[in-house]
Amino acid sequence: MDTPLLNFRKVHFVTSAPDIRHLPNDGGIEIAFAGRSNAGKSSALNALTQQRQLARTSKTPGRTQLINLFELEPGKRLVDLPGYGYAQVPIEMKLKWQAALSEYLQKRESLKALVLLMDIRHPLKDLDLQMLEWASNSDLNILVLLTKADKLNPGPRKTVVQQVRKATMVFGDSVRVEAFSSLKGTGVDEVTRILSDWYQPEDTPDEISEAE
């Protein structure tokens, strides 16, 4: 039976927090979006939700270095994590951001999946691999979105997708890789299907036995 598709246009902003200790109660299901500062994360979120200003695009690092929570339905949250990889920020600030990302990915009980965005022309940088390792160690479902797919012709695009799929096999079979273009809408329907499935509550042992 196919999972009903969720309406991501209903997503609305809830709160921002500098770290895990300032987030709301750790219940329900969260799916987080993360990526380097130039990976097109804000544009992807806006395309998925069809809300142009949901994730404000900013070239100023300080404006986007908070954990931003949005609610889709009661108990179903979408999380916009701080972008990483800025070149023009002090090392102390970089380390602080990385610590906040690591803590959230490894300690947030309601976190079920990570959507990791990478520019299709420059995938799998060091910090991307670190994020994949943290998410894999936390047994999260992982969706790698290769953004700006419109920048490549179909042949090279398919080649990169296949290369990244092969490279991420080391992180287990919970990793999916898809091409994505906010400009052309490529991948939006597939992301909607995947996330709708991941937002479904898992059956508990009691529920399974009752069904039998």
Swiss-Prot record:
GO molecular function: GTP binding; metal ion binding
Binding site for Mg(2+): 42, 64
The entry's keywords: Cell cycle, Cell division, GTP-binding, Magnesium, Metal-binding, Nucleotide-binding, Septation
Binding sites annotated in the UniProt record for GTP: 35-42, 62-66, 80-83, 147-150, 180-182
GO biological process per UniProt: division septum assembly
Cofactor: Mg(2+)
Gene Ontology CC terms: cytosol
All residue ranges annotated as the EngB-type G domain in the record: 27-201
Top-level division of the source organism's lineage: Bacteria
Cited Pfam families: MMR_HSR1 (PF01926)
PANTHER family: ENGB-TYPE G DOMAIN-CONTAINING PROTEIN (PTHR11649:SF13), MSS1/TRME-RELATED GTP-BINDING PROTEIN (PTHR11649)
Role, per record: Necessary for normal cell division and for the maintenance of normal septation.
The family this protein is said to belong to: Belongs to the TRAFAC class TrmE-Era-EngA-EngB-Septin-like GTPase superfamily. EngB GTPase family.
Name used for this protein in its record: Probable GTP-binding protein EngB
Organism from which the protein derives: Tolumonas auensis (strain DSM 9187 / NBRC 110442 / TA 4)
